């Protein structure tokens, strides 16, 4: 069987890892073994935090809608209940944007929901 030389493949693999970790501090961007560990850790953290970001944004939207709803004399819980009863399809992100950017429109929505 002929000999297979793997110098190029190994060098390319290490170069890819070191390129991934090029912005890291100290030996985490210079030495392959520590760079490899930190690269895997960074990818795991970014994967975990993408899910965490979604949860945090939903909490922020709910907080904003709750504050705006209480300014109009209704709790967040009742507002969502009335929206479901009237079959109005506004999600929390859109409600939060309306509450911040157009307070008059938000109060109009609440008045229409409550009165009917």
From Swiss-Prot:
Chief localisation class: plastid
GO cellular component annotations of the record: chloroplast; ribonucleoprotein complex; ribosome
Subcellular location: Plastid, Chloroplast
TM regions (residue ranges): none
GO biological process: ribosomal large subunit assembly; translation
GO molecular function: rRNA binding; structural constituent of ribosome
SUPFAM superfamilies, sorted: Ribosomal protein L20 (SSF74731)
Pfam families registered for this protein in UniProt: Ribosomal_L20
Protein role: Binds directly to 23S ribosomal RNA and is necessary for the in vitro assembly process of the 50S ribosomal subunit. It is not involved in the protein synthesizing functions of that subunit.
Protein name as it appears in the record: Large ribosomal subunit protein bL20c
